[in-house]
UniProtKB/Swiss-Prot annotation:
Function: Involved in the production of itaconic acid, a soluble unsaturated dicarboxylic acid mainly produced from sugars.
Keywords: Lyase, Mitochondrion
Species of provenance: Aspergillus terreus (strain NIH 2624 / FGSC A1156)
GO cellular component terms, A-Z: mitochondrion
Name the UniProt record assigns to this protein: Cis-aconitate decarboxylase
């Protein structure tokens, strides 16, 4: 028997272990505060889906998809229409990611809700078509499996390393998270869960060059949701894949996505299962307050602090006195966002990914929300924003690479024409040092959801999600999510 054959029969690897954990996870295994937190993460994902459903690039995605996809049984959030499960999952994921307001992980960058919720919702509707009822606790358990597995698999390949090398990391290690969440919802055995994982992992991909223009970055986490859902549904139907996909020495997920990274060891297999059942990544999923890449939230918060400290100095009327803005970033942030836009007009997605443009709009508007990146009325062509963006110089600081939770850190120094300067450092932005309070997430939900639908529906969804653990059938929730919404930009 060859070594590879022996490996294929082994049941002791980390793939088997995390699949066994996911398949057998029960409510009693999970602390009550984790169960409660999961509901608020679901609520945040729903808010982002609603507010993202009718922005121009989402409408274009729906228009293109509807032109070739037949109707199906799975609801499209905010449109009153249905598609097949794979198409619905991709579409709903594109909505959650559409505005850069959705959650992120500060050590292993990915956007969990945009992967987990679309896959789990679609899988639940597949089961409903078969006459099966899915409860709220079924959804919570599946979501927690996704919330817990994505960051662990990401950390096994050094979190942001993929991002530094040009991969859209969340689209890569989000695929197995989507498969595990889907598999949990479908009730897969540990063996079938491994099949789902293998099918998802062999499709994993995502190029970060998508950040420089176009619309496709908005749906790349949708590829992960699709891959995970497809893996789960095929495994549910008895389709088989390789076992031990994560740790295989030839063609395995961890091996292939760490080639050439210069690390020793190149990957940390043990991270896949580290702290399962005792440490909960559900609490390390970060909530965004700014509509831009999470890796630059530290610099944005630093500018905010300076604006509060020096209101006259940084008043909009006095911004012409700024000679230069220096910003120091972590390796991940500098690789991803430390670039100066050269082409005008900039696209919305490029604006949300460029630290120079992001800090410029924060200085001009004293906020960094969806409106700052709207493509309407020449908003992205404002001369005062461009003048400031070209005064920003990003650089790397090794100081921010020492702690995985400092990937979003930033030090900003603003230099004025008279030679004076002001400086502020934020190592861990709000929600990183300590989890964002649930009450703050609820406020964000109400604000975003209230901008696109009526108050009564906002309240209905809120009540259903926050009592999800007591909901015997999630159909009423999915029906409400399907109701048409309006654009937040008009």
């Amino acid at each position: 028997m060859t070594k590879q054959s022996a490996d294929s029969n082994a049941k002791s690897g980390v793939t088997a272990e995390i699949c066994h954990w996911a398949s057998n996870l029960a409510t009693d295994d999970i602390p009550s505060d984790v169960l409660e937190r999961a509901k608020y993460l679901i609520l945040d994902g729903i808010a982002c889906a609603w507010v993202g459903a009718r922005v121009p690039w989402s409408e274009k995605y729906v228009q293109a998809t509807m032109s070739f996809e037949p109707p199906g049984a799975c609801r499209v959030i905010g449109y009153g229409q249905k598609l097949g499960p794979v198409a619905a999952a991709m579409t709903n994921s594109a909505f959650i990611q559409a505005t850069e307001l959705d959650d992120y992980h500060s050590e292993a960058p990915l956007h969990s809700a945009s992967i987990v919720l679309p896959a789990v919702f679609a899988a639940s509707e597949v089961l409903a078509e078969q006459g099966k009822t899915i409860s709220g606790i079924d959804v919570i358990l599946a979501a927690i499996v996704g919330f817990e597995s994505g960051p662990r698999i990401g950390k096994a390949i050094y979190g942001s390393d993929l991002l530094n090398n040009g991969w859209h990391c969340g689209a890569v290690y989000g695929a197995p998270a989507g498969a595990l969440a889907t598999g949990k919802l479908l009730g897969l055995t540990p063996d079938s869960m491994e099949d789902a994982l293998g099918i998802a992992c062999t499709q994993a991909c995502g190029l970060m060059s998508a950040q420089y223009g176009g619309m496709v970055k908005r749906v790349q986490h949708g590829f992960a949701a699709r891959n995970g859902l497809l893996g789960g549904l095929l495994a549910y139907g008895g389709y088989e894949a390789m076992k031990g996909v994560l740790e295989r020495s030839y063609g395995g997920f961890l091996k292939m996505f760490t080639k050439g990274n210069g690390r020793e060891p190149p990957y940390k297999e043990e991270e896949v299962v580290a702290g399962l059942g005792s440490f909960w990544h559900t609490f390390t999923i970060r909530i965004k307050l700014y509509a831009c890449c999470g890796l630059v939230h530290g610099p944005v918060e630093a500018i905010e602090k300076l604006q509060r400290r020096y209101p006259e100095l940084l008043n909009r009327a006095n911004l012409s006195n700024i000679r230069h803005v220096y910003v120091q970033l972590s390796t991940a942030s500098n690789s991803h966002c430390g670039w100066i836009p050269e082409e005008r007009p900039i696209s919305s997605i490029a604006g949300q990914m460029s630290v120079a443009y992001i800090l410029a709009v924060q200085l001009v508007d004293q906020q960094c929300l969806l409106a700052q990146f709207s493509e309407f009325d020449d908003n992205l062509e404002r001369p005062e924003v461009w003048d400031l963006a070209r005064k920003v110089t990003p650089s790397h600081s090794e100081e921010f690479d020492q702690d995985g939770n400092c990937l979003s850190a930033g030090r900003v120094r603003i230099e004025f024409n008279d030679g004076s300067s002001v400086t502020e450092t934020v190592e861990k932005p709000l929600g990183v040092k300590e989890p964002m309070p649930n009450e703050r997430i609820l406020h964000k939900y109400r604000t975003l959801a209230g901008s696109v639908t009526d108050e009564s529906r906002v309240k209905e969804i809120e009540d259903l999600v926050l009592s999800l653990d007591r909901l015997t059938d999630i159909t009423p929730l999915l029906e409400l999510l399907n109701c048409p919404v309006k654009s937040p930009l008009v």
